[in-house]
Amino acid sequence: MNKRRVKMRKEIRLSGFGGQGIILAGVILGRAAALYDNKEAVQTQSYGPEARGGASKSEVVISDEPIDFPKVIKPDILVCLSQQAYDKYKDDIKEGGVVLVDEDLVSTDKMPEVDVTMYKIPFTRIASEEIKLPIVANIVMLGALTRLTNIVSKESMEKAILDSVPKGTEEKNLLAFSKGYEVAKEL
């Protein structure tokens, strides 16, 4: 009997506003999948005309086969680090998807139209209070995302972070990743 292998295609949308490192987070996620987990990955991005404060979105498609369409249609995983992003994208998520929000920046009074698993984590507060560096909230988020979804391995993400962050910031970024990973263990 010939068994058909089930294809794995996961669509991830990371969203927030300019200056939060959304694009870098998408690049790191795609790099972890493609270079270190030996998966296929495509990363696309869009942002408003403002350098900081405007809407920002990074989408990553991860698959175990060649990716025939590089855009996210219905995300399996949605991350929102701003209220504007949550309000705009919450109803795009797939039934049974996973939503992560920064609980200090996003009110989830209005839930997505479909059943999802919602995680509310204070990414920015963890970065500010525990690492003393608010700019690494995106890396805290990647730690939680990795732990909660297993979309890529922890080791692959750590390698991709080291490849991607500015020289001299590696230790703080790995600490941020570790904090996010640990806080997700408690959920």
Curated annotation (Swiss-Prot):
Keywords: Oxidoreductase. InterPro entries: 2-oxoglutarate_synth_KorC, PorC_KorC, Pyrv/ketoisovalerate_OxRed_cat, Pyrv_flavodox_OxRed_cen. It is an enzyme of class 1 (oxidoreductase). One of its GO terms (molecular function) is 2-oxoglutarate synthase activity. The keyword Oxidoreductase applies. Its EC number is 1.2.7.3. It comes from the Archaea. It catalyses: 2 oxidized [2Fe-2S]-[ferredoxin] + 2-oxoglutarate + CoA = succinyl-CoA + 2 reduced [2Fe-2S]-[ferredoxin] + CO2 + H(+). Heterotetramer of the KorA, KorB, KorC and KorD subunits. This is 2-oxoglutarate synthase subunit KorC. It comes from Methanocaldococcus jannaschii (strain ATCC 43067 / DSM 2661 / JAL-1 / JCM 10045 / NBRC 100440) (Methanococcus jannaschii).
